[in-house]
């Protein structure tokens, strides 16, 4: 814009409620304020994508990660089905404050789900856990419904093998 390179996406006001997807180019290096990307400002967003070639953030299945790694950077607030990249450990607050989230798919290769990994997801119905998970903390779910199904094995989707 006018000779300036935009490298940060920081919202001062909430996005309109009809915005369902965000797409970030290779120039974007950060979202929102440190530690709270877009928090409370993008409540209708269901998916977020990053252009290939961005060295600082990447996306997969509508979720943004740090670099090309497995550390979650931003999960859209209105996402309903979350497929996480394989990560050794799903730590505290990896998934939090997602009011519309109904399903979580943990990818094969993940071994540990720590306490409070999934927090404040009031619509959560089920979590698919692969065979590779050998430790799932009894308090991994916090402020989530008491009747969340934990399904070990298949996701029921032909292209996702666990």
Language-model-derived ranges and their functions:
Residues 66-69:
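Short acidic-glycine loop/turn motifs at beta-strand connectors
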Residues 1-32, 40-62, 73-89, 98-112, ...:
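Structural signature of tandem-repeat unit edges
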């Amino acid at each position: 814009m006018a000779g300036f390179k935009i490298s940060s996406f920081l919202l001062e006001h909430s996005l309109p409620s009809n915005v369902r997807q965000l797409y970030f180019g290779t120039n974007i290096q950060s979202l929102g304020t440190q530690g709270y990307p877009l928090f409370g400002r993008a409540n209708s967003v269901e998916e977020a994508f990053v252009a290939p070639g961005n060295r600082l953030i990447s996306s997969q299945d509508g979720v943004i990660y740090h670099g090309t790694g497995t550390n979650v950077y931003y999960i859209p607030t209105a996402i309903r089905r979350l497929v996480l990249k394989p990560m050794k450990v799903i730590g505290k607050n990896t998934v939090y404050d997602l009011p519309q989230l109904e399903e979580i798919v943990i990818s094969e290769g993940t071994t540990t789900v720590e306490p409070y990994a999934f927090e404040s997801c009031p619509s959560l119905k089920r979590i698919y856990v692969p065979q590779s998970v050998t430790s799932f903390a009894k308090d991994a779910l916090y402020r989530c419904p008491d009747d969340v199904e934990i399904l070990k094995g298949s996701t029921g989707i032909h292209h996702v093998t666990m």
